[in-house]
From Swiss-Prot:
Known role: The proteasome is a multicatalytic proteinase complex which is characterized by its ability to cleave peptides with Arg, Phe, Tyr, Leu, and Glu adjacent to the leaving group at neutral or slightly basic pH. The proteasome has an ATP-dependent proteolytic activity.
Gene from which the chain derives: PBE2
Family, similarity comment: Belongs to the peptidase T1B family.
Protein name: Proteasome subunit beta type-5-B
Source organism per UniProt: Arabidopsis thaliana (Mouse-ear cress)
EC numbers for this chain: 3.4.25.1
Pfam families: Proteasome
Claim: rRNA processing is one of the keywords in the record: no
Subunit structure: Component of the 20S core complex of the 26S proteasome. The 26S proteasome is composed of a core protease (CP), known as the 20S proteasome, capped at one or both ends by the 19S regulatory particle (RP/PA700). The 20S proteasome core is composed of 28 subunits that are arranged in four stacked rings, resulting in a barrel-shaped structure. The two end rings are each formed by seven alpha subunits, and the two central rings are each formed by seven beta subunits. The catalytic chamber with the active sites is on the inside of the barrel.
Keyword Hydrolase among record annotations: yes
Keywords associated with the record: Cytoplasm, Hydrolase, Nucleus, Protease, Proteasome, Threonine protease, Zymogen
Chemical reaction(s) catalysed: Cleavage of peptide bonds with very broad specificity
Class of enzymatic activity (EC top level): hydrolase
Length: 273
């Protein structure tokens, strides 16, 4: 038995565009864009992103000691050899007990830290408890891993205090994740490590630890042209994070290397000798 479907077959009129052939002619005359002459178009895109990646510079550091975690950073933002800002906030408050640092592309770091803060808050609402530092760093690493090779520029430290005590992790834009007791990230990190490694002790007081962090940032800004501005120091303890200081590195120079007053008579006496 064959169904009669003749009543269902209708011809839809074309309104305002003429015939189908006219429509196809219009599409064929539209401008076209040639693809790059390469067999690996995805690989070409990744290389193109690397070619236009701007130079960046910063100095951030964090270390664990007996009273919690000390976090410090400078505030200079650069675009190649151009200093675009001296007041960038490179230590971001994820929640009252956790901090993140920025090194790399400012937009990438700010976006992913903001995204991490939202997810940490949702975790707290769903589970009735704060997320651990380990869990937050793993969450960020997983998110960045899913975008690896896409041109992101992120080098961050996640520092905080949870039920197990202080925690410190380094996370990069490829999804890498490292646990440690002290890290320094950025173009000024080799200079900061020189001071940090020589002066680090686990049993420091809060005042000693903050001075070590401040001095490490200062010496990095003194040698690294892409670091500068203000040296901000934060402490994360059992009661949450606290900002301890924010000193201009230009003023810190005269704090560590004071200039003795010289009179004109003294200069004349030295010249006579």
């Amino acid at each position: 038995m064959k169904l009669d479907t003749s009543g269902l077959e209708t011809t839809m009129p074309v309104i305002g565009f003429g015939s189908n052939s006219e429509m196809l002619d219009g599409f064929s005359s539209a401008p076209s864009f040639d693809l790059p002459r390469t067999t690996d178009f995805d690989g070409f895109q990744k290389k193109a992103v690397e070619m236009v990646k701007p130079a960046k510079g910063t100095t951030t550091l964090a270390f664990i000691f007996k009273e919690g975690v000390m976090v410090a950073a400078d505030s200079r933002a650069s675009m190649g050899g151009y200093i675009s800002s001296q007041s960038v906030k490179k230590i971001i408050e994820i929640n009252p007990y956790m901090l993140g640092t920025m090194a790399g592309g400012a937009a990438d770091c700010q976006f992913w830290h903001r995204n991490l803060g939202i997810k940490c808050r949702l975790h707290e609402l769903a589970n009735k408890r704060r997320i651990s530092v380990s869990g937050a760093s793993k969450l960020l690493a997983n998110m960045l891993y899913s975008y690896r090779g896409m041109g992101l520029s992120v080098g961050t430290m996640i520092a905080g205090w949870d039920e197990t005590g202080p925690g410190l992790y380094y996370v990069d834009n490829e999804g890498g994740r490292l646990k440690g007791d002290r890290f320094s990230v950025g173009s000024g990190s080799p200079y900061a490590y020189g001071v940090l490694d020589s002066g680090y002790k686990f049993d420091m007081s809060v005042e000693e630890a903050s001075e070590l962090a401040r001095r490490s940032i200062y010496h990095a800004t003194f040698r690294d042209g892409a670091s500068g501005g203000v040296a901000s120091v934060y402490h994360v303890g059992p009661q949450g994070w606290t900002k301890l200081s924010g000193d201009d590195v230009g003023e810190l120079h005269y704090h560590y290397y004071p200039v003795a007053p010289i009179t004109a008579e003294h200069v004349m006496e030295e010249a006579a000798e």
